[in-house]
């Protein structure tokens, strides 16, 4: 059986693809780096859309905030361009947010790698599963 997607999910997926191209092509502000749209959440009434982004190469919170500010100020222009590309009765208002999950995931991966490295250094003691054999 095919997986069911709601209308808002389909709109969000299409918006994600279209916005990625529009930002790359149309937004010429140097304060906006290499933006990746990680997710788009569209409200049930299709009136608002939260666009979650990451910015490659910008780890500084001020730079990220500046990129978000620029994208939010360009939201009207991007919305107008989306209206030309998408066949919708009304295009949602765009709200850009920084996606912290990618940075959090990288931090957790680093913690896990460090813990594994420490365990391998102290590897003299057998693991509890190995002791039973």
Swiss-Prot record:
Disulfide bridge positions per record: none
Keywords carried by this UniProt record: Cytoplasm, Ribosome biogenesis
SUPFAM superfamilies, A to Z: Ribosome-binding factor A, RbfA
A Pfam family it matches: RBFA
Single biological process term from Gene Ontology: maturation of SSU-rRNA
One MF annotation (Gene Ontology) recorded for this entry: ribosomal small subunit binding
Entry GO CC: cytosol
Family affiliation: Belongs to the RbfA family.
PANTHER family: RIBOSOME-BINDING FACTOR A, CHLOROPLASTIC-RELATED (PTHR33515:SF1)
Subunit structure: Monomer. Binds 30S ribosomal subunits, but not 50S ribosomal subunits or 70S ribosomes.
NCBIfam families in the record: rbfA (TIGR00082)
Protein name: Ribosome-binding factor A
Species assigned in the record: Pseudomonas fluorescens (strain ATCC BAA-477 / NRRL B-23932 / Pf-5)
């Amino acid at each position: 059986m095919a997986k069911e997607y709601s209308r808002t999910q389909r709109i969000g997926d299409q918006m994600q693809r279209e916005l990625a191209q529009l930002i790359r092509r149309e937004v010429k502000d140097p304060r906006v780096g290499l933006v990746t749209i990680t997710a788009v959440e569209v409200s049930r009434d299709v009136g608002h859309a939260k666009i979650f982004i990451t910015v490659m190469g910008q780890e500084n919170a001020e730079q990220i905030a500046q990129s978000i500010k620029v994208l939010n100020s360009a939201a009207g222009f991007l919305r107008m361009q989306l209206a030309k590309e998408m066949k919708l009765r009304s295009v949602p208002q765009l709200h850009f947010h920084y996606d912290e999950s990618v940075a959090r995931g990288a931090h957790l991966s680093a913690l896990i790698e460090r813990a594994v490295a420490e365990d391998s250094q102290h590897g003299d003691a057998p693991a509890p599963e190995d002791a039973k054999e």
